[in-house]
Amino acid sequence: FEVTDGLSGMLKLADGQVIGGLVRLGDTRPQVGAFDALRVEGETDYVGAEEWIEFIEAFEAVSAEDAAAFRDRLDYVAINVGTLEIFGLEFLDSSLRVTADVDHWVFDVIDDELKGQIRLSDDPSTPVEALINYLSLTSDDEGDPLLGVQSEDLVPIHVDVRSLVLDDEDY
């Protein structure tokens, strides 16, 4: 199938349900692949982590049965992102991989400035987990980027940073 210039795919269906296949984002068409699970690959100019989280929560709220079936069939989403925004920070030319685990969604991010994982639990009372192996930030002259942000504006999150580099200084 080809929906637009930037979305195409090959899917195997049974009784109106997706069994497997490949969905391709971007200008290249999908190559023949396995149909044992659903895979999404490609590239896009922009992804916002908050939008992904909101989409998953809304999707699961609409139909738990459809969400469970999708989750069971999904092997992975692997996309190259021009600009990846995560909680107000922007990263350029990132690799993003999304998988469904037993009780949470997993977002793996690899970038020159960031390497880590965000875990979104199925339990809405469980905070989002950000497990950061490496984070390199450069300060700017604009002051505190979080000035004016209130705690009620943020989702509950647990952050574990193993290596933080700020302006070339390793903390």
Predicted stretch roles:
Residues 1-171:
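Membrane-proximal interfacial segments on either side of biological membranes
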